[in-house]
Each structure stands twice: as C-alpha cells, then as structure tokens.
Amino acid sequence: MKIKIGNFGNNLVSRPEGREAFLSARAYIIKKDEKEFILDFSGVEVLTPSWIDEFILNLKKEFNTAAVSYENTNNPSVKESLKWLSK
C-alpha cells in the first residue's frame, strides 16, 4: 500500500501532528491485513524527525510484520529526518 505523506501537509513538524496523521491513516486508509507500506514523500517541503518518528514507529508497532519502504526522498529535510530515524 502506498501512503502519500504529502497528503498530511507539506510542513510536517510536530510529534502530535505525526501521531494524528498516523491515527487518521489507520482509521481511513490502512487495511488491517497490509503486508507492505511504501511511504511517498512527494510534496513534503519540511519534515522533522519528531513527526516521522511518531508516524513510522506507530506504523511499525501496529503492523510489525509489514515491510516499510520510502520513495521520493530527495528533499534534504526528508533525507536528514529519515537518516536520523535509522540511528
């Protein structure tokens, strides 16, 4: 399943906003039996480690057997936030 992160806004900065985005995705987009997630960062101008940490950690916690990959990560803000998350 592809999730267009840019649909949650182009400036994604706070932990509470990341949590709200995950809860919205879980309620309205994600099916319970998903096996793979592709997070598409097109349209995102600013991304902070706090926002993406909250979104991805909740995604991995709830769907722990699903694979998670990323696309359209050329934006420096997105690159650095994902790099920070992988530490």
Enumerate the language-model features and the residues they cover:
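Absolute protein N-terminus
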Residues: 1-2, 87
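Active-site loop/lid in soluble adenylation, ligation, and acyl-transfer enzymes
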Residues: 9
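Amphipathic alpha-helical interaction surfaces in cytosolic regulatory modules
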Residues: 12-35, 41-86
